Design a protein with these regions (language model features):
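Glycine-rich "substrate-gating" loop/helix at the edge of Rossmann-like oxidoreductase active sites
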Residues: 140-141, 168-176, 196-206, 233
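NAD(P)H-binding glycine-rich loop region in Rossmannoid oxidoreductase-like domains
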Residues: 50-94, 102, 122
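Conserved Rossmann-fold NAD(P)-dependent oxidoreductase catalytic core, especially the SDR/UDP-sugar
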Residues: 94, 98-142
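N-terminal Rossmann-fold cofactor-binding loop
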Residues: 31-35, 55-56
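N-terminal Rossmann NAD(P)H-binding glycine-rich loop of SDR-like oxidoreductase domains
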Residues: 4-24
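Flexible, glycine-rich beta-alpha linker
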Residues: 121, 160-181
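Alpha-helical substrate-binding/gating segment
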Residues: 183-191, 199-235
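Active-site Tyr-X1-5-Lys
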Residues: 138-163
Length: 239
């Protein structure tokens, strides 16, 4: 069975990706910077995963981790809206360049990159968004800018077949970000409901995003493509 390296393996999405791959017979190398969090991942349904402690911003780490690997899912990123531009560029852009270099050196069959639909964000409503509806000059924040630049790096490189996945608004068991923060804020002071809360949001069950990433590994037709991933069930924000 094929061997897959997953960066960002102990992140919210990464944990589900590791378990999804293991459940379908893949050998998985779970890559991350903190051994204790990788060990916690292994204890939480990923017993068969091989652990690799490292930083994909260090070329020697990611190159060593990719040795003998058939596929790489690059889910690791600096994914906050706060911070210095230099940190986003180092992690999300130059880090991705190092992952690509590691894939080339190890002759990896395919790289699946986890991007973000945040790149579509603007100061107006966006509905029925297609994968091509991206403004390459969008600099609304450093995270968005870094993801756009990382995608540009992937499109312009040669030698590593790539797939780009943009999963929207993940939720599920183990989420410590979007939904818990909204609940906490609402309990503390209430959340302002613009347009009475009738504005639409599209969120995605994390299991569906993990499935999409596995299918991106398996499908030859996916190579060179970009995919928005959502549940396809827009809901009013107040719901």
């Amino acid at each position: 069975m094929s061997r897959v390296l997953v960066t960002g393996a102990y992140g919210f999405l990464g944990r589900y990706v590791v378990r999804e791959l293991l459940a379908h017979g893949y050998e998985v190398v779970a890559f991350g910077r903190k051994r204790d969090k990788l060990e916690a991942l292994r204890a939480d349904g990923a017993e068969a995963a091989e652990l690799f402690v490292g930083d994909f911003c260090r070329q020697e780490d990611i190159t060593a981790a990719a040795k003998g690997v058939d596929f790489v899912i690059h889910a690791g990123a600096l994914s906050t809206v706060w911070g210095k531009r230099s940190d986003f560029m180092e992690t999300n852009v130059r880090g991705t360049q190092r992952v690509i270099r590691a894939c080339k050196q190890n002759k990896v069959e395919r790289l699946v990159f986890v991007s973000s639909p945040s790149i579509y964000a603007g100061k107006c409503d966006r509905l029925n968004i297609r994968e091509t509806d991206c403004d390459a000059s969008n600099c609304l924040n450093y995270y968005i800018e870094s993801k756009i630049l990382a995608e540009k790096v992937l499109r312009e490189q040669r030698g590593v077949p790539c797939v780009i996945i943009r999963p929207r608004g993940l939720f599920g068991v183990g989420d410590s970000s979007i939904i818990p923060r909204l609940i906490k804020a609402n309990r503390r002071s209430g959340i302002p409901l613009f347009r009475g809360g009738h504005n639409l949001v599209d969120i995605t069950c994390v299991e569906n995003a993990a499935l999409a990433l596995r299918l991106a590994v398996e499908s030859e037709a996916a190579v060179g493509q970009v995919y928005n991933i959502t549940n396809g069930e827009p809901q009013e924000f107040r719901a």
